[in-house]
Amino acid sequence: GEVPTVPTESPERLLLRNFHIAMGSLLFLCSFFRAGLWLIHPPQNNNSKLPDASYAQVHVLQFSLYCAFIAQGISGILNAWWDGLIQFVPGVDTINHGLWVTVGYLHSAFGFFYINLILFILLFRIYHMIRYRAFSLNVFA
């Protein structure tokens, strides 16, 4: 079969790109806020059944997830800048295909990285629920 694609210069592609940029920007800003809040007010282990080491393990993974979102946001901004989608200095040509491709691959790699982090967080949470009977609905604290 054929892989479904959206033509490069179509209005649908522009809509999808703008949606991607808007959602990515929102995730970047929320993650930046959440990581800052995390540093100011670190989470406390309120569950008496869960050992401190297990609690710290999951929260290090969760903090790493926010850092991955922030890194992906930075690589997304650089990717859009070197593709000419955004300009920080009017009239300056910032299009650089080599940097655009390199940062684009990095942007994609961060996506795969945070998918794996989410999987590990969920698996460790399930493991802790089974082993320690420490149930928590707050999966991404």
Regions picked out by a protein language model, each given a short descriptive name:
Residues G1-A141:
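Membrane-embedded alpha-helical bundles that constitute the cytochrome b-like, heme-associated redox core
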